[in-house]
Amino acid sequence: MLLEVQHVRKEFQNRTLALTDASFSVSQGDFVSVIGPSGAGKTTLFRILNGSLRCDGGAILVNGVHFESADRRTRRAIQTTIGTIYQDFALVENATCRQNVLNACLPDMAFLPAVCGFFGKERVAEADALLERVGLADKVHEPVKNLSGGQKQRVAIAGVIAMEPACIVLD
């Protein structure tokens, strides 16, 4: 099983219960929809899946490994298994499209190499090819802040594809 979410619970400090008993599993090749009204906890669940939030109960297993109790190195490896595209796209607005795609592949928000051009020609060519695949070949050097919402979404998609995750979550 690629991903198992077992009875996940999340309560925020203000006593808001965001998730009460989220449970589902995802196998390789599955398409799964998490649906619900605004405020139902979907984004909270996705933030738990990528490790930016901790759950208060239940378990998340990725390829059979318990995510919450894994050491930092293992958690980082697990996080690369799940690529997430959020509603706000989580892009660096002043950086170019290419820099944002390259940055998506870096651990722990280490953005400096993308900004300073420390990537090899092969990696840059891969980023440019991904931008071409999402219809943004002419925007490679364009700062993200100059793009439309749909174009920003495509940069975010290219960045997640660059990570080569086993699972992609679209918020």
Language model regions located:
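A short, flexible loop at the N-terminus of ABC-type nucleotide-binding domains that lies
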Residues: 1-5, 10-21, 71-72
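The feature captures the beta-strand-to-loop junction immediately N-terminal to the Walker
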Residues: 35-37
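ABC ATPase NBD Q-loop/coupling interface
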Residues: 59-77, 118-120
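Conserved ABC ATPase "signature" region
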Residues: 66, 113-138
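Conserved ABC ATPase signature
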Residues: 143-147, 151
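Catalytic Walker B motif of ABC-type/P-loop ATPase nucleotide-binding domains
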Residues: 168-171
